[in-house]
Amino acid sequence: MGKEKIHINIVVIGHVDSGKSTTTGHLIYKCGGIDKRTIEKFEKEAAEMGKGSFKYAWVLDKLKAERERGITIDISLWKFETGKFYITIIDAPGHRDFIKNMITGTSQADCAVLIVAGGVGEFEAGISKNGQTREHALLAFTLGVKQLIIGVNKMDSTEPPFSQKRFEEITKEVSAYIKKIGYNPATVPFVPISGWHGDNMLEASTNMPWFKGWKIERKEGNASGVTLLEALDCIIPPQRPTAKPLRLPLQDVYKIGGIGTVPVGRVETGVLKPGMIVTFAPSNVTTEVKSVEMHHEALQEALPGDNVGFNVKNISVKDIRRGNVAGDSKNDPPMQAGSFTAQVIILNHPGQISAGYAPVLDCHTAHIACKFAELKQKIDRRSGKKLEDDPKFLKSGDAAIVEMIPGKPMCVESFSDYPPLGRFAVRDMRQTVAVGVIKGVDKKAASSGKVTKSAVKAGKK
């Protein structure tokens, strides 16, 4: 066994009919964790449904159906391997809660793969004012996904098929609009592909002899290649934030007989170790960590990305709950937010939003109503430049700086300090009406909280 490959998370974005599912299905199918038996079963079912209907998308539809029904499917089905990386597709749109997931997401994507359809009239539909292509790309950039790969799909259905002119036209237009969003097109590979036929997916296509390959320039090093797989292999692996202070948002708190209280969550930044004195905000409870476990094995330290359970001393299940954040009591401990300033982008709200609006915010694992206390300024969502002070209201498409006040105690952080705790989705009318990034937090000095005896004792050591 060689050295373990690096794990990378990607998110696949693009318009409904761009062929995302087929393209993603193709990668998972050819390089992924789906075993032969499952594939044969899918193929047989597809053949029974009318033989031509088997496409790679079928694989994804089966997986999606299982995901939607709440069956925890074997997560390896959403993984595939490249020469350098193990890649996990953390979400693909078309899923009801895609936008919310992308924000509160179980993990941050290291790279977004944007699929645009090259077929006649299709590209135009996806890129039109209300097409989702723009919204998804804007969202990815706003949420800190700084690497982008573009697959110009369905090259087999251009006029004429595999048209160089069409590919160049689309590349030019997409470059212009990702540049407006904030991406630098020189760093973005554009790959002409057919997710169904497999052109330029894993192997260079013989149908496009004119395509000499993609080239990118970036300060971390230039790269070039021909296929989509090679482009994925050129992703720059993220620096995992182990050096930052600990932040661990709780997903659940269990009471386990004979052990005691066990909070469960994902380490977002920093390191969690047995023996540490942790503080939970906004509950303001401090105690000692007795042990840390992942997949029923004791750990000496848990790192960013690890989903762990940890046993805490002298704390009841009533003291802490989902949405609380654990941190190191001696190193920038988490605190309750009295209020915070955020940059929000209104995505789809049927009316006008004015001061006093109080929707529910989903930020990390917290789910709390927050009031838009003050609309400070309307800004240009691309450049961030101020357009007007104290706007009376905001509508779909607007970006603004707002002051927000949580309706109940809540712990959030600025995006620049702790990214996963600094981005949120605004939910109303069962949909995501806005997304936001926290610029600054007014932290509330807590009145004396509960400090357990074990914490006091361990603190004296």
From Swiss-Prot:
Keywords: Cytoplasm, Elongation factor, GTP-binding, Methylation, Nucleotide-binding, Phosphoprotein, Protein biosynthesis. The modification 5-glutamyl glycerylphosphorylethanolamine is found at E301, E374. PANTHER family: TRANSLATION FACTOR. GTP binds at residues 14-21, 91-95, 153-156. Residues 14-21 are annotated as: G1. The modification N,N,N-trimethylglycine is found at G2. Residues 70-74 are annotated as: G2. Residues 153-156 are annotated as: G4. It comes from the Eukaryota. Oocyte. Residues 91-94 are annotated as: G3. One of its GO terms (molecular function) is translation elongation factor activity. Pfam families: GTP-eEF1A_C, GTP_EFTU, GTP_EFTU_D2. The keyword Nucleotide-binding applies. It is found in: Cytoplasm. This protein promotes the GTP-dependent binding of aminoacyl-tRNA to the A-site of ribosomes during protein biosynthesis. Residues 194-196 are annotated as: G5. Residues 5-242 form the tr-type G domain. It comes from Xenopus laevis. Belongs to the TRAFAC class translation factor GTPase superfamily. Classic translation factor GTPase family. EF-Tu/EF-1A subfamily. This is Elongation factor 1-alpha, oocyte form. GO terms for biological process: translation; translational elongation. GO terms for cellular component: cytoplasm.
